[in-house]
């Protein structure tokens, strides 16, 4: 903790999803190490993982699909997905309000998905800082992406009902912002991906968004991994934690790298596929339902990834060439960014045959220009500041340095004056 900052109560809010909890943990660990009292609102399934970094878990019941649920549980359309988040937010808000009724924090820290956190920050009159584990909106995003994406859903009866319910919930809580503005435009946000992964980074509002890059830590609690003796090249294959039901793809990976002279394959298959479904495995192939990904990437020569935000930045941070095989949502955009940076090749799942995987792998690992680009990006990421800079920026928002906001119930038009906005002078000091 810096000498200018008095210890504070910082409350973090997130959902039960690996891709949203994991990116925050090292930031939380750093805030605890600086002497702050940190609480972390989270469903029980992540309580132990959160507690291991130092905060006190504040448990709440969530109606969102769990971390090991099939992707189909989120629905098949954009509107299905957003309704699921809104339903959960509405039922979670009273739980969280009760949990913090006698322990109002000095600052609210929250994942981008935690609508209740932002409502409570307004109610309590405390600053709120969003942690974004993936890309953020740029100037022009609404016209270029959001409007075309939402044009049809808005015209349906279900779409109109969704917006009406969202607006009513916000108004019940004294917030006059449009739901899209409330959900997608926080007053202050720390972006936990490297700027290199952000589309149109030059058009991102730097008065709101600060790229601090990867906040990884050493991940010692995840265990280590030993590169086998004699392995000239190591390839890690992982489709993350959600979209892992791909036995045919895994079999193609075994065919591509199994018995390839000098190569060793580490294959993470998740909990929805069994090793038996992959057939006979050569001696140079190891299969696991989960692996300590960062520990392996620090020793790997190639990463076959779904291009989730976490995996993409870990590949960049370890300067590992990538084959991106996106499965859903933002992964397709991430894959495009990686390919555009010249450090990866993007393949569709259906075209990722053994022959093409092997051909692409050999081209990537033998290309000195790919290695040079990766080293440059790795150096740029190191300059973004990571965990310590994130903690510094959070401390800068604390009431000791920050004008405390009036509670939402005591002032009109709260949506027009979001909590947590600093002056240009305060920002330039950082």
UniProtKB/Swiss-Prot annotation:
InterPro entries on file: EryCIII-like_C, Glycosyltransferase_28, UDP_glucos_trans, UDP_glycos_trans_CS, UDPGT_MGT-like
Protein name: Oleandomycin glycosyltransferase
UniProt key word Glycosyltransferase: yes
KW Transmembrane helix (keyword) present: no
PROSITE patterns: UDPGT
GO MF term set: hexosyltransferase activity; UDP-glycosyltransferase activity
Record GO biological process: antibiotic biosynthetic process; response to antibiotic
Function: Specifically inactivates oleandomycin via 2'-O-glycosylation using UDP-glucose.
Enzyme class, spelled out: transferase
Keywords for the protein's UniProt record, in alphabetical order: Antibiotic resistance, Glycosyltransferase, Transferase
Region annotation Disordered: where it falls in the sequence: 385-430
PANTHER family cross-referenced by the UniProt entry: STEROL 3-BETA-GLUCOSYLTRANSFERASE (PTHR48050), STEROL 3-BETA-GLUCOSYLTRANSFERASE UGT80A2 (PTHR48050:SF13)
Record gene name: oleD
């Amino acid at each position: 903790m810096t000498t200018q900052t008095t210890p504070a109560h910082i409350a973090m809010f997130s959902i039960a999803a690996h891709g949203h909890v994991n990116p925050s943990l090292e930031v939380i660990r750093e805030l605890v190490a600086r002497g702050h009292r940190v609480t972390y609102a989270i469903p029980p399934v992540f309580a132990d993982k959160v507690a291991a970094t130092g905060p006190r878990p504040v448990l709440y019941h969530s109606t969102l699909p769990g971390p090991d649920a099939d992707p189909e549980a989120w629905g098949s359309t954009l509107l299905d997905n957003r309704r699921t988040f809104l339903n959960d937010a509405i039922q979670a808000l009273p739980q969280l309000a009760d949990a913090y009724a006698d322990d109002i924090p000095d600052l609210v820290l929250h994942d981008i998905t935690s609508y209740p956190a932002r409502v409570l920050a307004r109610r309590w009159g405390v600053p709120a800082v969003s942690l974004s584990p993936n890309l953020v909106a740029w100037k022009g995003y609404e016209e270029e992406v959001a409007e075309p994406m939402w044009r049809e859903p808005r015209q349906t009866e279900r779409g109109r009902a969704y917006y009406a319910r969202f607006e009513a919930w916000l108004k019940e809580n004294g917030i006059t912002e449009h739901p899209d503005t409330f959900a997608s435009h926080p007053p202050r946000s720390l972006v936990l991906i490297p700027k290199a992964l952000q589309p149109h980074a030059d058009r991102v509002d730097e008065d709101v968004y600060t790229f601090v890059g990867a906040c990884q830590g050493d991940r010692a609690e995840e265990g280590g991994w030993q590169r086998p003796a004699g392995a000239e090249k190591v390839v890690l294959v992982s489709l993350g934690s959600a979209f892992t039901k791909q036995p045919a793809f895994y079999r193609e990976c075994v065919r591509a790298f199994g018995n390839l002279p000098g190569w060793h394959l580490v294959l993470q298959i998740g909990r929805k596929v069994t090793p038996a479904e992959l057939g006979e495995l050569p001696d140079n192939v190891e299969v696991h339902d989960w692996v300590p990904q960062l520990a392996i990437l620090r020793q790997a020569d190639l990463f076959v990834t779904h291009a989730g935000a976490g995996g993409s930045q870990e590949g960049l941070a370890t300067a590992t060439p990538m084959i991106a095989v996106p499965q859903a949502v933002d992964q397709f955009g991430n894959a495009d960014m990686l390919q555009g940076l010249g450090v990866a090749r993007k393949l569709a799942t259906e075209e990722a045959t053994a022959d093409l995987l092997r051909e692409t792998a050999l081209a990537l690992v033998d290309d000195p220009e790919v290695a040079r680009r990766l080293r440059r990006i790795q150096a740029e990421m190191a300059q973004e500041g990571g965990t310590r800079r994130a903690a510094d920026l959070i401390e800068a928002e604390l009431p000791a340095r920050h004008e405390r906001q009036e509670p939402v119930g005591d002032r009109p038009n709260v949506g027009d004056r979001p909590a947590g906005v600093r002056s240009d002078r305060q920002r330039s000091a950082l």
